């Protein structure tokens, strides 16, 4: 059975929902609600930040320094945890000020600059640690279990 993509995409307990909360998004939603196969989320910040301000927030939350391309003010975000760098055009088409994902490819930097969208690469592992913790807590509460998340640092 497959669990990775459903864990990424779950609107309440998934990796994307959790990363949205860490960034300060109060109401994250799927970028394309009509296509559940697109694991990109979007949302609005309650108060505008600079791209570097958002990167600093992520650095504290994820305990790592992200790669930042671009600058300017951010209110509208799109993001996809893990290896979501291929969705940057969808984020730009949706009018996001910044696109956040786990990985970066060489072309991602060029696409960001050409499309005028800021980009933050925050680490594949770092962006996907929180969905499994949320599901663990949910299962523990529902089934009366105890659980422990063992985080093994990964530079990727």
Regions found by a protein language model. Give the residues of each.
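Active-site catalytic microenvironments in core metabolic enzymes, especially phosphate/sugar-handling
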Residues: 1-156
């Amino acid at each position: 059975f497959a669990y990775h993509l459903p864990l990424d995409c779950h609107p309440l307990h998934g990796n994307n929902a959790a990363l949205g909360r860490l960034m300060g998004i109060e109401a994250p939603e799927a970028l394309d609600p009509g296509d559940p196969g697109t694991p990109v989320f979007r949302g609005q910040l309650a108060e505008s930040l600079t791209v570097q301000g958002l990167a600093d927030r992520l650095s504290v939350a994820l305990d790592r320094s992200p790669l930042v391309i671009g600058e300017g003010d951010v209110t509208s975000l799109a993001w996809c945890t893990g290896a979501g760098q291929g969705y940057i055009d969808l984020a730009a088409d949706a009018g996001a000020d910044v696109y956040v994902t786990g990985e970066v490819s060489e072309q991602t930097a060029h696409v960001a600059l050409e499309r005028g969208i800021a980009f933050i690469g925050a680490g594949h592992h770092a962006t996907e640690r929180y969905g499994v913790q949320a599901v663990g807590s949910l299962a523990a509460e529902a089934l009366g279990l105890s659980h422990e998340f063992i985080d093994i640092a990964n530079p990727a």
